[in-house]
Each structure stands twice: as C-alpha cells, then as structure tokens.
C-alpha cells in the first residue's frame, strides 16, 4: 500500500510496484469438525490404554477447556489452582503472534484426571517430549478408536458445546484465547442443525 501511495498519489517514479505481483493467499476454510459424544467415549477408552499416561488428560483438556497442544505441553502443576479449578497459561501465542498470559477454567473431570498422573521431574502435566511425539500418540489412539478427526477438533468441540450451552462469545474467547472474534464466529456457524431447530421451536 505504501508503494502504491508513493507511485499514484505522490507521483514518485519507480520502475514497478513489485508488491502487486504478490499473490494474496486465501485463508483456508475452517472445517468445523467436532468430536461426537460417541467418538469422545471411544477416544478416552483407548487413551486410557495408551503408553502415554497423559493422553486421556490431554484429550479432556482440549474438549473441556479448549487448550492448544502447545499450551498443554507447557502446562505445569504450579500454575494449577486445584481448589478454584483454574490454570494460568504462561507465554501462549495466538494467531497474531502476540505472547500473552491468561487464566482459564478447568472442568471437574480434568482436575480429577490430572490428580491421577504421576508427578514429573520438570513439573509439567503433559510430559510429551515434543509436538511430534504428542501427535504420534494421538494418531495411534484415534486410529484404534476409529476416529479420523484431527486433535485440533477438540477446540472446535469445546466452542460448539459452549455455544450450545449459551455461553457468551466473550466468555468463550477468554477461555480459548481467541483475539479475533471473527475467527471464533466460524465455530458458531457450525452449530448442529437439530440444536438450532430446537432453539427456533422454543421461540414460538
């Protein structure tokens, strides 16, 4: 834009505006896939048998609390308030690459599952050695459960269920860490048709 302004409005001579040659890529469409209740049961069942003792808790953290994989791997016991059911997420990054800290709520079953885990030497709750290792265990679990969805779908599942339970948009954004509400609206747009039909019916 600055180059075009200089050429068009200020009559500055430049051989060409190279910026105009850059193709602007369209943002990929959000798939909106959510994990069904039956799929959740199957995933948690097989996660309980995984060599990764933390996998069941990780799936719950995604579905119940909307944590990103990186946030799970960075979560430490010292940042969890077991009495208040909250966790402080430190140095998390949103899509704008701005580093932030935020405090989120944890579900009762997440609290109970975390309490069952063996304490690690480095204080982390989800002790995956890397993102790749995390996804390898997830792939094994989802294949055994007969589920084809990505782990990121756990966050979409949280958003959809929260919307169905009449959470306010700002509350969901605070929990998920979304800075762009328009991105979050995409999750809302994928609500199940049966649920929306019932909402309309109740308006009558």
Mark where each language-model region is.
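Conserved tyrosine-mediated DNA breakage-rejoining catalytic core shared by Y-recombinases
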Residues: 20-23, 27, 39, 74-116
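Non-catalytic DNA-binding core/recognition domains of DNA-processing enzymes
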Residues: 1-7, 22, 106
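DNA/chromatin major-groove-contacting recognition/catalytic segments
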Residues: 99-105, 174, 186-204
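Short, charged phosphate-coordinating catalytic segments
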Residues: 4-17, 60-84, 170, 174
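Short, basic (Lys/Arg/His-rich) helix/loop patches that form interaction surfaces
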Residues: 48-55, 119-125, 135-174, 181-182
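N-terminal core-binding DNA-recognition domain of tyrosine site-specific recombinases/integrases
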Residues: 1-4, 11-15, 29, 50-53, ...
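C-terminal catalytic core of Y-nucleophile DNA break-rejoin enzymes
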Residues: 95-140, 145
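Basic, Lys/Arg- and aromatic-enriched nucleic-acid-binding interface segment
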Residues: 13-69, 73, 155
């Amino acid at each position: 834009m600055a180059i075009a302004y200089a050429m068009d409005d200020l009559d500055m001579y430049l051989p060409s505006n190279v910026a105009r040659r850059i193709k602007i890529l369209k943002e990929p469409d959000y798939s909106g896939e959510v994990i069904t209740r039956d799929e959740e049961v199957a995933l948690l069942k097989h996660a309980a048998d995984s060599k990764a003792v933390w996998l069941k808790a990780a799936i719950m953290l995604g579905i119940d609390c909307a944590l990103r994989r990186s946030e799970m791997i960075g979560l430490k016991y010292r940042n969890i308030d077991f009495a208040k059911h909250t966790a402080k997420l430190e140095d998390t990054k949103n899509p704008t690459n701005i580093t932030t800290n935020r405090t989120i709520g944890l579900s009762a079953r997440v609290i109970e599952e975390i309490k069952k885990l063996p304490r690690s030497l480095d204080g982390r709750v989800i002790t995956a050695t890397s993102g790749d290792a995390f996804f390898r265990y997830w792939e094994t679990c989802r294949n055994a459960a007969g589920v084809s969805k990505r782990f990121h779908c756990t966050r979409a599942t949280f958003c959809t269920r929260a919307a169905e339970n009449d959470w306010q948009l700002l509350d969901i954004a605070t929990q998920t860490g979304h800075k762009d509400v328009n991105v979050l609206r995409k999750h809302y747009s994928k609500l199940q048709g049966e649920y929306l039909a019932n909402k309309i019916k109740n308006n009558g």
